[in-house]
Regions:
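An acidic-aromatic substrate-binding cleft motif
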Residues: 46, 55, 69-132, 140, ...
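Short proline/glycine- and polar residue-rich coil/turn motifs
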Residues: 29-36, 411-419, 750-753
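Extended substrate-binding grooves/exosites of carbohydrate-active enzymes
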Residues: 67-378, 382-389, 394-402
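Extended acidic/polar, glycine-enriched regions
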Residues: 3-84, 430-433, 437-484
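Beta-strand/loop-rich accessory regions of lumenal/periplasmic or secreted enzymes
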Residues: 49, 425-434, 449, 454, ...
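A short beta-turn/strand-edge loop motif at beta-sheet boundaries
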Residues: 5-12, 383-391, 580, 609-615
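Carbohydrate-binding surfaces of carbohydrate-active enzymes
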Residues: 294-505, 599, 769-773
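Short edge beta-strand/loop segments characteristic of extracellular beta-sandwich folds
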Residues: 2-8, 376-384, 761
């Protein structure tokens, strides 16, 4: 241990270094002057890491004539950061950064942020498994570094240096490579190092952000190294890793990142992804893909999501409605619009679906079943310094709603970086017919920590169980009657009536006892409300391919009936304005005497490869349901919204909410609330309503507004609600990606123009019997 101390005044300097329990580890004194050097050799110390943040306190006292004239103290940590081969290490171990970029921001105070809010930021990060912060793009207030030291966060501290605007003027290196600016560059880094040097959480000094590269950065790096050789130097703008200790990139696509991991490019330096997965609006997708690369290639040592917080300005109107405003809302122009609304945390400090997903993706305890349906599971400890002694597994056997067995596994001792094989058996259960069963495992903290209570969940996993029994029952044979006019076909069974529009070839009504359940039948749609991450696709979709103007055209319709069922066959063509691509559609509706209707839709793609969109937002159907049915229950992935490239945090289950609960309140309204793999959904009032079942599973959205209403709104308060409920059932729904700045949807998660088939059934249900009816299989 050693320290250099600047002094003013006369007297004797006395110092004490105490551990976290207050026990003196070392002490001494020195005569005061302009400066003093103190040092001590400690036989052993408890080291500091983000996982095990242990702090000592150094107290300095100036004494004159036996009395203390001045006293200060600061907390210190012991840790070593160095590069070994193509990885950087903390205390000798290569670590993985699961980080976020952080701006100082408050929706009420702007750049003025309360200390308690800063503390809550760090606590919330820890609770979501985040272990690192890049302060972008300037040093933050001093207190937050204390919180990072205390709770355990790795920090990249960044100099307040950015001259990105020169890039747009095509003279990017104008001042960066001009020696007359050397002092300005060096000064900003030196001030940062001098102020923040004593914080153990800081493992890298960043020379700045997006300022090209030139002689002034070389001088800046020299100055920083002269002051502090114990930390690494970072600067993404050093594209060749000429002066930095790590090779840093931003918004690298998955393919490019994999290439970095597989090669020794850029001097084989450790790689840091200083910005990635731009969290603007609905997203980011592909987080699990990035994490898989980080956990596969040693050289790829993780990165920092852009960014932590949505920068909306809070306003409240005379009615008490809160709106978060962004660029252009005050008549300012030019503007970047809502490009500042790009965080994992919403302006009201609600974790976004993206943050919930990120927490699961970076969970430090990973689990996988070995074999298709066995009892053997692999558990890997992705901590760098902690064993799993402090973790327990809370296990439950469930059908998605009812829990049949619970038990706890609390004997894990897995060492850091090690994989262990566990046997997790379960007892025999009186399985219900036609149900799916799962083993749900929640990974939890045994004891209270500084940042979370005992029992805090780090992550969760779900594994299907093999005990499903399929038992069918014979459908009750009841009469069906068909009546027809010049414009309509009506099919009646009991007191349920299905009406089909013969002019447009569409289900125009489903009624039960005179009450309308469905007001507009399924029609094909390939559109979704624009998401920020599709911003480079939207113009193409809207103005070149007119996907929001898709429509069906009837070719012909036939009706056949027997004593106990009737069938309506409708052949149609789907296309968009002035387009040669589309689908040939065949709807087959089978109506049974018990009042239920099975719907099959077969689509044959009409291709025109030279003049068709690369991919579509979705392929599915849309229906209008009676607006009185606002209670929503479903069996599928949940509880929150999930998409094909953002569903690690979702598990299969039976969930209940209302139509408002199916909406995610993004600052800039956009596609939201989707659920994947939905096997059934009921829309009811307090007593009864509509049940939709799909054995193969569909994607689902339920809202009280149209796609166009969502697309037209600039803020949530501007969304024009309607009486009807809009129900979307999707064959496929494209992923999210993060292409507002970065990776677009991966190829396998783009909905192509291709043949498809989907099926689902509609029926009336009493609310309390919806689940029972949904799991009934008829023959």
């Amino acid at each position: 241990f050693d320290a250099q101390i600047r002094l003013a005044g006369e007297g004797t300097l006395k110092w004490v270094l105490a551990d976290a329990e207050g026990v003196t580890a070392a002490s001494g004194e020195a005569e005061a002057g302009e400066s003093a050097s103190i040092s001590a050799r400690l036989e052993s110390v408890r080291t500091w890491t983000a996982e095990t943040p242990y702090l000592y306190t150094l107290t300095l006292s100036m004494e004159q004539n036996g009395a203390v004239s001045h006293q200060v103290s600061c907390r210190l940590g012991f840790r070593r950061v160095e590069v070994k081969g193509n990885v950087f290490t903390v205390n000798g171990k290569a670590g993985l950064i699961n980080g976020v970029n952080h701006h100082d921001y408050s929706p009420e105070g702007g750049r003025t942020v309360a200390l308690e809010v800063m503390r809550q930021d760090v606590l919330l990060m820890k609770q979501h498994n985040i272990n690192a912060i890049r302060f972008s793009h300037y040093p933050s207030i001093e207190a937050i570094y204390d919180f990072c030291d205390e709770y355990g966060m790795y920090v990249i501290d960044e100099a307040d240096l950015e001259c990105h605007g020169f890039e747009w003027a095509h003279v990017y290196d104008m001042i960066t490579d001009d020696p007359s600016w050397e002092n300005a560059y060096v000064d900003r880094a030196v001030r940062m190092v001098e102020r923040d040097y004593n914080h153990p959480s800081i493992i890298m000094w960043s020379l700045g952000n997006e300022s090209c590269f030139g002689v002034n950065f070389k001088k800046e790096a020299e100055a920083v190294r002269a002051m502090d050789s114990s930390r690494l130097i970072h600067y993404e703008g050093d594209f060749e890793a000429e002066i930095t200790d790590v090779y840093s990139t931003m918004y690298s696509r998955l393919k490019g990142l994999k290439e970095i991991g597989e090669t020794k490019m850029k001097h084989n330096r450790p790689h840091i992804h200083c910005e990635y997965s731009h969290a603007m609006g609905n997203g980011p997708g592909c987080l699990a893909d990035y994490q898989k690369l980080y956990r596969t290639y040693d050289r790829l040592q993780g990165g920092f999501i852009w960014e932590w917080y949505d920068h909306g300005i809070k306003t409240t109107d005379e009615n008490g409605t809160v709106t978060y405003k962004y660029g252009g809302n005050y008549g300012d122009f030019p503007t970047n619009g809502n490009f500042c609304i790009d965080g994992l945390l919403m302006p009201d400090r609600t974790p976004s679906p993206g943050l919930v997903e990120y927490k699961q993706v970076i969970c430090p305890v990973w689990m996988e079943r070995l074999g298709e349906m066995g009892d053997l599971f692999a558990v890997k400890n992705y901590y760098d310094f902690k064993t799993l002694d402090g973790i327990y597994l809370e296990c439950a056997v469930t059908d998605g709603k009812e829990t049949f067995e619970t038990f706890t596994i609390d004997s894990l001792h897995t060492e850091p970086g090690v994989e262990e094989i566990l046997t997790i058996p379960h007892s025999a259960v009186d399985w219900k017919d036609n149900r799916d069963y799962y083993l749900n495992i929640s990974v939890r903290e045994k004891k209270e920590t500084a940042w979370a209570p005992a029992g805090h969940e780090l992550g969760h996993y779900q594994f299907p169980l093999p005990e499903k029994k399929t038992v069918s029952v014979k459908r009750e044979e009841l009469p069906v009657s068909v009546s027809e006019t010049a414009t309509e076909v009506s099919i009646s069974c009991q007191d349920v009536v299905y009406s089909f529009d013969k002019v447009h070839g569409v289900l125009s009504s489903m009624k039960k006892g005179g009450q309308e359940l469905v007001k507009r039948g399924p029609v094909l749609t390939v559109d979704r409300a624009d998401i920020d991450n599709d911003m480079y696709k939207v113009n193409d979709w809207k103005n070149n391919y007119f996907i929001s103007r898709g429509m069906e055209e009837l070719e012909y319709m036939t009706v056949s009936s027997g004593q106990n069922k009737a069938q309506v066959y409708i052949q149609k063509h789907f296309g968009c304005y002035n387009q040669a691509w589309g689908f040939k559609l065949a709807y087959v509706y089978t109506i049974y005497g018990d009042g239920s209707m099975e719907t099959e839709l077969h689509g044959t793609a009409i291709r025109n490869p030279e003049f068709e969109p690369e991919f579509l937002p979705r392929i599915g159907v849309e229906m209008n349901v009676n607006g009185a049915f606002r209670q929503v229950a479903w069996y599928g992935m949940g509880p929150g919204e999930n998409y094909c490239d953002s569903r690690q945090a979702a598990v299969m289950g039976v969930y209940e909410t209302d139509v408002d609960g199916m909406h995610t309140d993004y600052v800039m309204p956009q596609e939201n609330g989707h659920r994947e793999n939905v096997r059934w959904v009921s829309l009811t009032d307090e007593k009864e309503g509509l049940l939709i079942t799909s054995r193969g599973g569909v994607g689902m959205n339920v809202h009280d507004y149209t796609t166009e209403a969502l697309r037209s709104a600039a803020h949530p308060c501007e969304i024009k609600k309607q009486d009807d409920i809009v129900l979307n059932l999707d064959w496929k729904h494209s992923g999210l990606g993060s292409n507002s700045c970065g990776q677009e949807q991966t190829e396998e998660r783009k909905v192509r123009i291709e043949d498809f088939a989907m099926s689902f059934a509609l029926s009336f249900t009493e609310r309390e019997k919806a689940e029972e009816r949904a799991f009934t299989v008829f023959c």
